């Protein structure tokens, strides 16, 4: 019996955070035995916001090395760089022709990013969700791991796929309609200084973010200064409505140690101050990240191995993507290349 197909991507823009790890990359490693996984470093998506060429080049290699360091196995999964598979851009253009302007203008992420990058609101940023739809539909993905900020994009991908199928192949659909995959993760990884906001790798205030490759001393320092509250006496309790800062730290501690929230509350019952708890959270995060960092540095220095991973991944992805694109071109009426 064939495994369900999963597609997920990571952007090579900015340093990846522990939020990227706990919310996505750790699940990538865990899903490999039960799913047919297609994992992509989405450099085409990255340039919807202006990038320094040298920085993008290095960030793409960094992201690939991190994927390998967290346990993505190229023998189990297809790991590739998006721009190495031209079918993504080809199908993306075609799907533009089956997407309505009104649909794209309603995308909340476009509204947010266009406000942030007001001096560079380009067509690529507007059409970002269409390329994402192409990423998904090329591989017949049954499930797509998505966070709250990407749910709307997945819904659009479903709408585009359904529209195309109804026009050209209602009896024998070309595109699989993808479903969201909701990861089972305890941690809602929020900003360290304002736990009402999601931790973002692009946050201008670096005190809010812990990156995957962060120095251990810096991790400890940031956790020590993280938001808590002024409740007297101090109380370690998982309560997002009233204790967001503590709940955020509990989520990180749970993710790093495997302890439940109930176990954490019991362990720190009757604390006189938050300092010892923060110390334990920082040390747990360091212990979680140190082996990943060591493996990352080993892989990053082996460019020959990374080249081979990219080459094999692109070959595997292209073979599957080309099959889908051929079917699409045929039903649309394109003349095949002799």
From Swiss-Prot:
L-tryptophan binds at residue 135. Gene3D superfamilies: HUPs (3.40.50.620), Tyrosyl-Transfer RNA Synthetase (1.10.240.10). It is found in: Cytoplasm. A motif ('KMSKS' region) lies at residues 198-202. GO terms for cellular component: cytosol. Pfam families: tRNA-synt_1b. CDD domains: TrpRS_core. SUPFAM superfamilies: Nucleotidylyl transferase. It catalyses: tRNA(Trp) + L-tryptophan + ATP = L-tryptophyl-tRNA(Trp) + AMP + diphosphate + H(+). A motif ('HIGH' region) lies at residues 12-20. One of its GO terms (molecular function) is ATP binding. InterPro entries: aa-tRNA-synth_Ic, Rossmann-like_a/b/a_fold, Trp-tRNA-ligase, Trp-tRNA-ligase_bac-type, Trp-tRNA_synthetase. One of its GO terms (biological process) is tryptophanyl-tRNA aminoacylation. The keyword Cytoplasm applies. ATP binds at residues 11-13, 19-20, 147-149, 189, 198-202. Its EC number is 6.1.1.2. It comes from the Bacteria. Keywords: Aminoacyl-tRNA synthetase, ATP-binding, Cytoplasm, Ligase, Nucleotide-binding, Protein biosynthesis. Catalyzes the attachment of tryptophan to tRNA(Trp). Belongs to the class-I aminoacyl-tRNA synthetase family. Homodimer. HAMAP family: Trp_tRNA_synth_B. This is Tryptophan--tRNA ligase.
């Amino acid at each position: 019996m064939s495994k369900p197909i999963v597609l997920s991507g990571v952007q090579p823009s900015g340093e990846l955070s522990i939020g990227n790890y706990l919310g996505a990359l750790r699940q990538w490693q865990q899903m490999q035995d039960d799913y047919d996984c297609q994992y992509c470093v989405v450099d085409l998506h990255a340039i919807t916001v202006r990038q320094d060429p040298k920085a993008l080049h290095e960030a793409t290699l960094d992201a690939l090395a991190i994927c390998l360091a967290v346990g993505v196995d190229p023998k189990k999964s297809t790991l590739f760089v998006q721009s190495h598979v031209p079918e993504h851009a080809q199908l993306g253009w075609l799907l533009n022709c089956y997407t309505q302007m009104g649909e794209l203008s309603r995308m909340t992420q476009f509204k947010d990013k266009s406000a942030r990058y007001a001096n560079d609101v380009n067509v690529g940023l507007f059409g970002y969700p269409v390329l994402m739809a192409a990423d998904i539909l090329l591989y017949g993905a049954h499930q797509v791991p998505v966070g709250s900020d990407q749910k709307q994009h997945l819904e659009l991908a479903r709408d585009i796929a359904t529209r195309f199928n109804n026009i050209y192949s209602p009896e024998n659909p070309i595109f699989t309609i993808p479903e969201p995959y909701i990861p089972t993760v305890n941690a809602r990884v929020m900003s360290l200084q304002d736990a009402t906001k999601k931790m973002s790798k692009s946050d201008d205030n670096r005190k809010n973010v812990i990156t995957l490759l962060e120095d251990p001393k810096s991790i400890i320092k940031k956790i020590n200064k993280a938001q808590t509250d002024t409740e007297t006496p101090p109380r370690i309790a998982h309560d997002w409505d009233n204790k967001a800062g503590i709940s955020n730290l509990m989520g990180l501690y749970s993710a790093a140690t495997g302890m439940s929230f109930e176990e954490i509350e019991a362990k720190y019952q009757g604390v006189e101050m938050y300092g010892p708890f923060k110390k334990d959270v920082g040390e747990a995060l360091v212990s979680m990240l140190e082996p990943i960092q060591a493996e990352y540095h080993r892989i990053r220095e082996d460019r020959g191995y990374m080249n081979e991973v990219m080459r094999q991944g692109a070959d595997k992805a292209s073979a599957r993507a080309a099959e889908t694109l051929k079917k699409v071109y045929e039903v649309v009426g394109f003349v095949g290349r002799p």
